[in-house]
């Protein structure tokens, strides 16, 4: 894996896997918090970063390999904090190791191609995918096919353009999002000066 810079942005890690006529691109964003990839947040424009990074990485790789098909392999958040595992003092090494692997598992979206999934992680220990006995993806697997990745990419580009236009038009309305129990004010450094009453 390597770091990639594009158009003013910096991607923490990009892994590529090259075939005869294809290049698969995987993007990893390191986080110190407990960030989870969520399509609802992406839809509302609150979690565009990974897909923006993927779009940038795909463009960079297309320039490097103009004669090859560039395919998204996956986008992931990886928690870089040292995990704390609660085990009894006499717990066996395998139980502790399994607990660590569970805590270190990346979350995100994976290309729905079983062969590619096994090439990325033959143990399936680090990516959010599991298989049924018949070889199909389990219901809780976080997968998208190539068409779905393309649709998400187009949606994010459109969303960015709408946000950009809104900013250029001077839209500075104080209207923080609220999804479930989360809202934009929770970690906002400007909450004491913006004038928004969170009790409304």
Regions found by a protein language model. Name each.
Residues 1-200:
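Structural signature of nuclease core domains in nucleic-acid processing machines
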């Amino acid at each position: 894996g390597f770091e990639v810079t594009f158009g003013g942005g910096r991607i923490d890690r990009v892994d590529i896997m090259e075939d005869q006529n294809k290049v698969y691109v995987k993007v990893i964003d390191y986080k110190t918090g407990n960030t989870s990839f969520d399509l609802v947040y992406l839809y509302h424009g609150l979690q565009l970063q990974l897909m923006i990074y993927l779009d940038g990485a795909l463009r960079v790789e297309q320039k490097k390999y103009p004669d090859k098909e560039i395919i998204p392999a996956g986008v992931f958040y990886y928690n870089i904090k040292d995990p704390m595992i609660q085990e009894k003092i006499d717990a066996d090494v395998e139980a502790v190791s399994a607990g660590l692997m569970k805590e270190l598992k990346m979350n995100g979206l994976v290309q729905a191609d079983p062969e590619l999934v096994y090439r990325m992680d033959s143990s399936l220990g680090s990516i959010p995918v599991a298989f049924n006995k018949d070889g199909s993806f389990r219901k809780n697997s976080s997968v998208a096919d190539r068409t779905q990745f393309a649709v998400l990419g187009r949606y994010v580009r459109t969303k960015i353009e709408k946000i950009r236009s809104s900013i250029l038009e001077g839209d500075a309305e104080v209207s923080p999002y609220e999804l479930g129990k989360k809202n934009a004010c929770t970690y906002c450094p400007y909450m004491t000066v913006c004038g928004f009453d969170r009790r409304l």
